[in-house]
């Protein structure tokens, strides 16, 4: 394979990292920004990921319900203010997190007067009700109600007809199931700048889930699905960059140490302290002891803990010995291996 062919994908600009901003409810809402992208890629990726998020992620939902004394969904229940049709509509809104395989059966019981909520459902094992305050129905004085739910896992939308087993007993009411843990997805594409070029794409996606999976993780799963589906279209194996691989093996230290400390997203105070102490690379930083760091002007315990936490996430710590550091051609090496840290 020639270098000219490899340029088809190697020279396209792509984001170095995603910008993820949690919403008011961090477990359910997030805004994700990817930039810069080649012109047209914002729409291509945004539309593809949105479709996968809404249709292809696994989740859990109620597939059927049996209500004592009720034969079909058009019935009414003595002492219950809502009719069965309204109760079923409420049941569809139950958000469920289920780790294992289904189907599983859950039971809810209630004596009036009072309100039956999703939290009254008696869960088992790996099942969790995520919106326990959801009202299912209201019972008057003296009313009794018992419901048995069937919960299963799946993807996308499944109509009630497909949820009816062939040997369904009398009184079993199948329910439309929306398995997708993603409730809403929107995206927009704007122009963004990279250097002197003004017409790159900026993709912004707003994602809302039911809480069984975070918005950021849901996007990661959707991207993995897309990646997996596209693999079959690649009819070649890309040769490894032998020279770079050999060079990495020759380095006497981890190439991640060539990363500059100003790329660590530290607080302004911590970053300025490192800059004033002429600490440029991670390799410079990790050779410092905690005592040495605390001697740095304006550098306190809070900054120290912040740096220790960042280094720990990379498998590093202060006070390390690095043989062969600093290399003579450190700037050249840093640029050469920036894709490997």
From Swiss-Prot:
Which class of enzymes does this protein belong to?
Answer: transferase
Intrachain disulfide bonds? none
SUPFAM superfamilies in UniProt: C-terminal domain of RNA polymerase alpha subunit, Insert subdomain of RNA polymerase alpha subunit, RBP11-like subunits of RNA polymerase
Alpha N-terminal domain (alpha-NTD), as annotated region: 1-237
GO cellular component terms attached to this protein's record: cytoplasm; DNA-directed RNA polymerase complex
What are the EC numbers?
2.7.7.6
Domain of life, per lineage = Bacteria
Alpha C-terminal domain (alpha-CTD): annotated segments: 253-341
Concerning SMART domains, the annotation shows:
RPOLD
Q: Does the keyword Nucleotidyltransferase apply?
A: yes
Which molecular-function annotations from GO does this UniProt entry contain? DNA binding; DNA-directed RNA polymerase activity; protein dimerization activity
List the Pfam families hit by this protein, alphabetically.
RNA_pol_A_bac (PF01000), RNA_pol_A_CTD (PF03118), RNA_pol_L (PF01193)
Q: What reactions does this protein catalyze?
A: RNA(n) + a ribonucleoside 5'-triphosphate = RNA(n+1) + diphosphate
Alphabetically, which GO biological process terms does the record hold? Answer: DNA-templated transcription
Q: Which UniProt keywords apply?
A: DNA-directed RNA polymerase, Nucleotidyltransferase, Transcription, Transferase
Described purpose of this protein according to its UniProt entry? DNA-dependent RNA polymerase catalyzes the transcription of DNA into RNA using the four ribonucleoside triphosphates as substrates.
Could you describe the subunit structure of this protein? Answer: Homodimer. The RNAP catalytic core consists of 2 alpha, 1 beta, 1 beta' and 1 omega subunit. When a sigma factor is associated with the core the holoenzyme is formed, which can initiate transcription.
The UniProt similarity line reads:
Belongs to the RNA polymerase alpha chain family.
NCBIfam families referenced in this protein's UniProt entry, alphabetically: PRK05182.1-2, PRK05182.2-5, rpoA
Q: What's in the domain note?
A: The N-terminal domain is essential for RNAP assembly and basal transcription, whereas the C-terminal domain is involved in interaction with transcriptional regulators and with upstream promoter elements.
* Name of the featured protein: DNA-directed RNA polymerase subunit alpha
Question: In which organism is this protein found?
Answer: Azorhizobium caulinodans (strain ATCC 43989 / DSM 5975 / JCM 20966 / LMG 6465 / NBRC 14845 / NCIMB 13405 / ORS 571)
Taxonomic classification:
Bacteria, Pseudomonadati, Pseudomonadota, Alphaproteobacteria, Hyphomicrobiales
What is this protein's gene name?
Answer: rpoA
């Amino acid at each position: 394979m020639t270098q000219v062919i490899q340029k088809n994908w190697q020279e396209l600009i792509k984001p170095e990292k995603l910008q993820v901003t949690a919403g008011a409810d961090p477990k359910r809402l997030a805004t994700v920004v990817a930039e810069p992208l080649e012109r047209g890629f914002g729409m291509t990726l945004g539309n593809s990921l949105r479709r996968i998020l809404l249709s292809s992620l696994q989740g859990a939902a109620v597939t059927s319900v049996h209500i004592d004394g009720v034969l079909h969904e058009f019935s009414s229940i003595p002492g219950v203010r809502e009719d069965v049709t309204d109760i079923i509509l409420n049941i569809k809104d139950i958000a469920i997190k289920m780790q294992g395989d289904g189907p599983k059966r859950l039971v809810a019981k209630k004596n009036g007067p009072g309100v039956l909520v999703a939290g009254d459902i008696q869960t088992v094992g790996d099942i969790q009700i995520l919106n326990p305050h959801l009202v299912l129905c209201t019972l008057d004085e003296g009313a009794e109600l018992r419901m048995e739910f069937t919960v299963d896992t799946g993807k996308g939308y499944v109509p009630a007809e497909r949820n009816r087993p062939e040997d369904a007993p009398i009184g079993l009411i199948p329910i439309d199931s929306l398995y997708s843990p993603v409730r809403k997805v929107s995206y927009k594409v704007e122009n963004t700048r990279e250097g002197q070029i003004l017409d790159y794409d900026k993709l912004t996606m707003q994602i809302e889930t039911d809480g069984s999976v975070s918005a950021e993780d849901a996007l990661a799963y959707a991207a993995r699905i897309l990646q997996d589906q596209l693999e079959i279209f690649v009819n070649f194996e890309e040769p490894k960059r032998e020279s770079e691989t050999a060079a990495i093996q020759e380095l006497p230290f981890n190439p991640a140490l060539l990363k500059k400390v100003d790329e660590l997203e530290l607080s302004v105070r911590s970053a300025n302290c490192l800059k004033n102490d002429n600490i440029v690379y991670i390799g410079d930083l990790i050779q410092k002891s905690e005592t040495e760091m605390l001697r740095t002007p304006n550098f306190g315990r809070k900054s120290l803990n912040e740096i220790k936490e960042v280094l720990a996430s990379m498998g590093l710590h202060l006070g390390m010995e690095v043989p062969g550091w600093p290399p003579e051609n450190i700037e050249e090496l840093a640029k050469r291996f920036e894709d490997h840290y």
